[in-house]
Amino acid sequence: MAYKPQYSQYDLTFDASAGVEPNFHGMFVQGDSLYCISRDDSRMDMVNIIDISTGKHSEKRLDSTASYYRTGTGFAGFKSKKLTIYDENFDKTGEVDLSKFIAELNASGESLLIYNGSNITMDTEGNIGIVSNMNTLYMVDANGVLLSRTECPDNMSRIEMVFVTNAGSWYIVCGGMNYGDTVFYPVDIKSGTLGDGMEDILYGDNNTVVDICPVDEDDFYIFSRNYVYRYISESATSEELCCLRDYGVEIDSQGMGVGSGFGMFTDNMPGIINYTGSQTEGDADVRNIELVTFVKTEGKAAQRTELVAATISEPSFKEREAVMRFNKYNPDYYITFKTYLDEDYHTDDRKEKVRLARQSF
């Protein structure tokens, strides 16, 4: 059994008559909809909601500007010592005042530094996990009171994200001293203590984790830059769904400074949303959105032949872009790069590897 990416295209149309192009500040997948947060010169954010069954989209004006996060109950927006809580339809349901918590940090010589979209999340009981400066996890209750703090383990270089499963199990994802080394740690949110690290969840290359999507009770999908995995809690093992680049899927393309968005559909399958381009049509500014979903395939339907491109250095953007298009649409073949640029390049062994790679290509 394997999973093959399936692509759908959607357009968002904005009024460009005032000469202001809205920027994207968040993209999410949730239920049967895609959510794109846009911001124009009004300094008010707008959530654009695309119904994937009809392709139609609606808009909701939000209270102000903020940084947005997907949580266990819907979404949250953080700004000015306040966390605004939204449900799965992006309707406001409440606020959490974090001013006392932040004042407590400042009094002790600390500060709250939040770097990316996976650094705040919330469980169904209102407990909030916040990763600050990529090295400390703060747990705060629904009233903004500090519950516990957890430092990054000494043998790891950073905390990349915090997440909570549907059953209420909390984890942090830590990056190791070497690029691509990733360890998952369970967290006791009352005491702040960590359980034993899980080191063998990811395998393959380019496996920096970019997002986690909980499913069922304690299972979760893992998006790395090159693979999608599912962690199976019952057996404490993971399975690879597919290699994204083999199918031409680029993660975190930074199309409008927002990268990619992730989330779960109602059928418990993960999805990826990407901004792919734009064009102006009269007074309309049209933004192109691509949705990637995953379809189960069996037997020969899941098999394609690998073509290896031997390169002396990393491929250029144009070369990689062309290969990604090929991998996305070719039903029989896909291309991978094998780079041989190192101090041993001129050895006979390295020359032979290059020759074999070029021959296979």
Predicted regions and their residues:
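Pocket-flanking alpha-helical
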Residues: D344-F361
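Repeated scaffold domains used in trafficking and secretory/extracellular systems
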Residues: G19-Q30, R61-T73, I102-M122, D154-A167, ...
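Short, well-ordered beta-strand elements
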Residues: Q303-P315, Y333-Y340
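Surface-exposed loop/turn elements that mediate protein-protein interactions on large endomembrane-trafficking
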Residues: A2-G19, S42-L62, K82-G109, N135-D154, ...
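Short, polar/charged alpha-helical segment
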Residues: P315-Y334
